[in-house]
Structure formats: C-alpha cells, structure tokens
C-alpha cells in the first residue's frame, strides 16, 4: 500500500479488525520508511446480480420483489415474517454463491418452490399457480397430483 505521506510502497500492518458487521476490514498500517501510521479499509467488491426476465430484459435482483411474492403465497399461513426473511437471505446467498452474475427468473422460481415445498404445501401451491401460470383447473390439478405422489414416495 502506498504511504499517503511519503509515497513509499512498503508498509506493515499494525492492527486489523472487522467493521460494518463484518462487511469490511479496517487496517492500521505503518510506513517502513517514514514510520507514520495510516488507516485503510478493505471491502469486498459486490457486483450486482442481474435477473434475466422471460422477455429477455435484465434488471438488478430485488429482494423486496422476492419477499412480496413470498408474502402473497404465505398469506394467512402459519409462517412468520422471520422465517420468510431467513428464506430470502438464504435464496439471495445461494444465488450469489453460484458465482453467476446473471440468473433467470426460472432459476429463482425453482429455488423458491423447492424451499416452499418443504415449508408449507399450501404456500407452495399458491406460488406455483402464479409462477407456472396455470391456464386452467386441469393444470392446477396436475400439480396437486404430482405433489401428492411425491408425498407418498417420501
């Protein structure tokens, strides 16, 4: 790191500690030439996660949209807001950990459905009815039959 006082490029780290709830690191450094101390901050470069919509347009990932969809699916169900927040955080972390900068709405929908299926089957069916755009009662019933078959297998 270049010393802000003398411009020398060698220094030693005197102290290092996490800040901003672990999202950055504060370092105290000492220049090996002029012995003056200075502080630097390191932060992970966060690249925005882009969502590819069905019409091929792109927009930044929006966790509020995800949360609103879950709230609608879980309306009047015994699922706490806390549980939904954890699910949103988990899904967002899963998407970021995939190391892909772009993700499709299909991928997000499949992740949400797999998590809802284990949490609450009614919420799962509600979400699936919007996500899969059931055109009539038969496609809706097919999804219910599939869910019941999977339940029997388990």
UniProtKB/Swiss-Prot annotation:
Instruction: Outline the extent of the ATP-cone domain.
Output: 49-139
Report the function annotation for this chain.
Negatively regulates transcription of bacterial ribonucleotide reductase nrd genes and operons by binding to NrdR-boxes.
Cofactor names: Zn(2+)
Q: Which GO terms describe its biological process?
A: negative regulation of DNA-templated transcription
Any coiled-coil regions, as ranges? none
UniProt similarity note: Belongs to the NrdR family.
Q: Do you know which InterPro entries this protein is assigned to?
A: ATP-cone_dom, NrdR-like_N, RNR_NrdR-like
Asked if the keyword Cytoplasm belongs to this entry, the reply reads: no
Bound cofactor: record note: Binds 1 zinc ion.
Q: Give UniProt keywords alphabetically.
A: ATP-binding, DNA-binding, Metal-binding, Nucleotide-binding, Repressor, Transcription, Transcription regulation, Zinc, Zinc-finger
A Pfam family per the record: Zn_ribbon_NrdR
Entry GO MF terms: ATP binding; DNA binding; zinc ion binding
Q: Where are the zinc fingers (unnamed)?
A: 3-34
Statement: the UniProt record of this protein carries the keyword Oxidoreductase: no
> What protein am I looking at?
Transcriptional repressor NrdR
Taxonomic source organism: Ruminiclostridium cellulolyticum (strain ATCC 35319 / DSM 5812 / JCM 6584 / H10)
Q: Which domain of life is it from?
A: Bacteria
Question: What does UniProt list as this organism's lineage?
Answer: Bacteria, Bacillati, Bacillota, Clostridia, Eubacteriales
Quick one: which gene encodes this? nrdR
């Amino acid at each position: 790191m270049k010393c802000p006082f003398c411009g020398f490029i060698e220094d030693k780290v005197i102290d290092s500690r996490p800040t901003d709830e672990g999202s950055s690191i504060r370092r105290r450094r000492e220049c090996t030439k002029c012995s003056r101390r200075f502080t630097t901050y390191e932060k992970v470069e966060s690249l925005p996660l882009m969502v590819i919509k069905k019409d091929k347009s792109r927009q930044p990932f929006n966790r509020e949209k995800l949360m609103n969809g879950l709230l609608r699916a879980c309306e009047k169900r015994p699922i706490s807001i806390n549980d939904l927040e954890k699910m949103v955080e988990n899904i967002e972390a899963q998407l970021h950990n995939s190391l892909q900068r772009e993700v499709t709405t299909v991928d997000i929908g499949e992740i949400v459905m797999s998590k809802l299926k284990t949490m609450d089957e009614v919420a799962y069916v509600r979400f699936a009815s919007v996500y899969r755009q059931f055109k009539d009662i038969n496609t809706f019933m097919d999804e219910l039959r599939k869910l019941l078959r999977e339940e029997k297998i388990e």
